[in-house]
Amino acid sequence: LAFTRSLTLHLSELPRGKVLGIVNFPTFRQAMAAAQHIVKLGPTAVELVDRIMIELALANPAFKPTIETALIGKPAAILLVEFAGADAAALQGKLRDLQALMGDLGLPGSVVPMPDEAPQKNLWEVRKAGLNIMMSLKGDGKPVSFIEDCAVPLEHLADYTDALTEV
């Protein structure tokens, strides 16, 4: 509880544009290790889609066309990297920076640029539907939301997720 006599609220203008770079990784660990470098580019969001989720989306006729637009080959994981801002040219530059970074990290040609709003929205919807897609697994075993988010320094994220996977 608090008593407030005065409050100053600083509002920011909503970004006018967004671009999405989908980074495809051959291993889950590489995706986790790359996060510490990707955040230095200043994205507004970085979200993981792992192999299980990718396979389930591909098996679902409603999601298959959308997820296919994001894939290069058969990745073990993808990161959805979103940049937002008012300057369209600057946003395109951010996508180029992401592509260059991935080349520097040994993964040239791993980024699917998605500059248009409609495909971005569709892909975010697939990501958002993740738990429902996971619940569509056949059989008695169903996924349990064990750890949603964690606070781990990014330089330790790959080791952390490796250790967690062993559990």
Please report, for each region that a protein language model flagged, where it lies by residue.
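Noncatalytic alpha-helical scaffold of FAD-dependent oxidoreductases
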Residues: 1-167
